[in-house]
A protein has these predicted regions:
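A short acidic, Gly/Pro-enriched loop at the edge of an enzyme's catalytic core
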Residues: 101-113
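A short SAM/SAH-binding and catalytic strip from SAM-dependent methyltransferases
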Residues: 112-125, 148
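Core SAM-dependent methyltransferase catalytic element
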Residues: 190, 214-215, 261-275
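Class I SAM-dependent methyltransferase SAM/SAH-binding core
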Residues: 43-103
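Conserved class I S-adenosyl-L-methionine
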Residues: 1-42, 53-57, 77-80, 88, ...
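Short glycine-dipeptide loop
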Residues: 64-65, 136-141
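Conserved catalytic/acceptor-binding region of the Class I
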Residues: 126, 141-206, 225-228
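C-terminal helical/coil "lid" or tail adjacent to the Rossmann-like core of SAM-dependent
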Residues: 2-3, 9-14, 195-254
Length: 275
């Protein structure tokens, strides 16, 4: 997939989320703070900071002697973040509008790096983790969240694409979709003491809500490609009909269960400087 086109898709997707904050998004993100110990005076990087949920909480813990840098690709999300930071009268957060892949911080710059629910969006996750390792000070830590490969109704769409159209639709969560995959990626980058905590955020959907999770269109924002764009209208219609029928088959008295298994992952850089 063309990288610049993909990044424009991501930016547009998040620019449309003008009311991002709610109980779900807040509670999901804020739990990252509990994954690592923060101290007064730390320098923190919050990757894909969004509306600064994590950045604000971290800034309040590290105090005025500390600093948080929040990076996000979406100007609309950063506008919401700026309003919240101003309202909270916080002065130790700097926001940067940028693709994190285009930034290059000095080695040993940060005590902690956070990233809430955004790692799967990155085009080269091993490279991203290697960068984070370099940017961290010796003894520094990272904390990020991601979802299991069984989360949401995505596996159903992927299965039907293979079964009906013989195409391999990439699952957004597949690269980091198990605790073992997360641990392997981090250890490859040099991290140690990897901890993966698992939590279930799933809920029941109505049949109509479940059907609307995929509208039968060609939209599929994924760094590993989008084979839906090559399908004919006839194929898309057939695929959508099969998806809706499968949803109806899965219905129970409570509705359609949408699994949302989230991993809260933390790890450390070795406490001595690498040569």
């Amino acid at each position: 997939m063309n990288s610049s086109f993909y990044k424009r898709q991501i930016t547009s997707f998040f620019n449309e989320r003008t009311k991002y904050d709610n109980d779900f998004t807040y509670n999901r993100a804020i739990k990252l703070i509990d994954c690592v110990d923060l101290a007064q005076g730390e320098t923190i990087l919050d990757v894909a900071t969004g509306t600064a949920i994590v950045a604000i909480a971290a800034a309040q813990i590290i105090g005025e002697t500390g600093k948080v840098i929040g990076v996000d690709i979406s100007p609309v999300m950063l506008s919401q973040a700026t309003e919240k930071i101003t309202e909270a009268n916080i002065n130790n957060i700097k926001l940067i509008e940028s693709d994190i892949d285009q930034l290059d911080f000095d080695n040993n710059s940060f005590d902690t790096i956070f990233c809430s629910s955004s790692v799967p969006w990155f085009t080269n996750i091993p490279h991203t983790f290697s960068n984070w390792y370099c940017w961290l000070k010796p003894g520094g830590k990272i904390a990020f969240s991601c979802y299991s490969e069984e989360s949401f109704l995505t596996p159903l769409i992927v299965e039907l694409c293979q079964e009906i159209c013989n195409i391999d639709l990439p699952d957004w969560n597949s690269i980091t979709g198990t605790p073992e995959k997360c641990q392997h990626l981090l250890e490859q980058a040099g991290f140690n003491n990897v901890v993966v905590k698992q939590e279930q955020l799933g809920h029941y959907l109505t049949i109509e809500e479940a059907k609307n999770t995929w509208k039968g269109d060609r939209l599929w924002i994924n760094p590993r490609g989008n084979p839906l764009i090559d399908l004919s209208e006839e194929q898309l219609t057939k695929l959508k009909s099969a998806y809706d029928a499968k949803i109806e088959d899965l219905a129970t008295a409570k509705g359609i269960w949408e699994d949302i298994t989230i991993f809260y992952v933390s790890a450390f850089k070795t406490s001595f400087k690498q040569k």
